[in-house]
Swiss-Prot record:
Signal sequence range: none
The protein's name in its UniProt record: DNA polymerase sliding clamp
Pfam family, one: PCNA_C
Keyword Calcium: no
Entry annotated with the keyword Membrane: no
Keyword list, A-Z: DNA replication, DNA-binding
GO process terms (BP): leading strand elongation; regulation of DNA replication
Entry-linked Gene3D superfamilies: 3.70.10.10
Gene: pcn
Known partners and oligomeric status: Homotrimer. The subunits circularize to form a toroid; DNA passes through its center. Replication factor C (RFC) is required to load the toroid on the DNA.
GO molecular function: DNA binding; DNA polymerase processivity factor activity
Family of the protein in this entry: Belongs to the PCNA family.
Xref: InterPro entries: DNA_clamp_sf, Pr_cel_nuc_antig, Pr_cel_nuc_antig_C, Pr_cel_nuc_antig_CS, Pr_cel_nuc_antig_N
SUPFAM superfamilies linked: DNA clamp (SSF55979)
Length: 247
């Protein structure tokens, strides 16, 4: 038994946030909600999503593993209208997930379930020296600037309280410098200076589905995986991206 009802717009944003990095995923559902952990195919990035039952208007579930093709699910959610209600139901007899959209009428899609085993991927417990709380729109625009120069970007923290997004090409550079007085910075927690370099395309994928006013929690340390967290309603998303170790 699995049945869940929520606003279609919110679920679409969750699926967009996941499908930018992985093609298929195993949702672990139980009486507490839906969760999933997955690595991207290159094992460079990890994503963790937790959708508690409080996120739903209605929620009833036993324990199941539901493996889905995210590309197929994303295409369906792209057809959803903002004011529609979404109902998810597990059809165990047909081994399908029913996706029902309701507003003035009812539209029903059914997708076959994948034999995707429950993931053993865990989010590692890492102690970070620095944390930046920042509006997502500022990060998205800064990454667009950095992309003009290189396909990698460095995230720096200075001891005097600055967060720097920096890229360097063969002849050109780009730098965005933000401090505590910047209106997009909610909070800076700094214990030490740090610098790490990351694949820019992955950072763009991680932030692609965010809204400009979403608050990102970015955890940083020198040559450490960057940890990025944000909330969609009651849903928590966590990303880890491995650094590019420079010689």
């Amino acid at each position: 038994m699995f049945k869940a009802v929520m606003n279609a717009k919110n679920f679409k944003k969750i699926i967009d946030s996941i499908s930018n990095l992985v093609d298929e995923i195993c949702f672990e559902v139980d009486e507490l909600g839906i969760k999933a952990n997955a690595m991207d195919p290159s094992h460079v990035a990890l994503i963790s999503v937790n959708i508690p039952k409080e996120s739903f208007d209605e929620y009833v579930s036993d324990t199941h593993d539901i493996g889905v093709d995210l590309e197929a699910l994303k295409k369906i959610m792209n057809r959803a209208k903002p004011n529609e209600k979404l109902m998810l139901e597990l059809d165990m007899e047909k081994n399908k997930l029913d996706i029902i959209l309701k507003n003035e009428g009812t539209r029903k899609f059914s997708i076959s379930l994948y034999d995707v085993s429950s993931s053993n991927v865990k989010v590692p417990e890492i102690g970070y020296p620095n944390e930046v709380m920042i509006k997502a729109g500022t990060i998205v625009e800064s990454l667009k600037d950095a992309e003009l120069v290189n396909d990698h970007v460095s995230l720096k923290i200075t001891e005097d309280g600055k967060f720097i997004i920096y890229s360097k090409g063969d002849i050109n550079t780009n730098e965005t410098v933000l401090d505590r007085d910047n209106e997009s910075i909610i909070e800076l927690k700094i214990s030490e200076s740090s610098k790490s370099t990351y694949n820019l395309a992955y950072l763009k994928d991680i932030t692609k589905a965010t809204s400009s006013e979403d608050i990102l929690h970015i955890h940083l340390g020198t040559d450490m995986p960057v940890k990025i967290e944000y909330i969609i309603g009651d849903t928590k998303l966590i990303y880890l991206l491995a650094p590019r170790i420079e010689s």
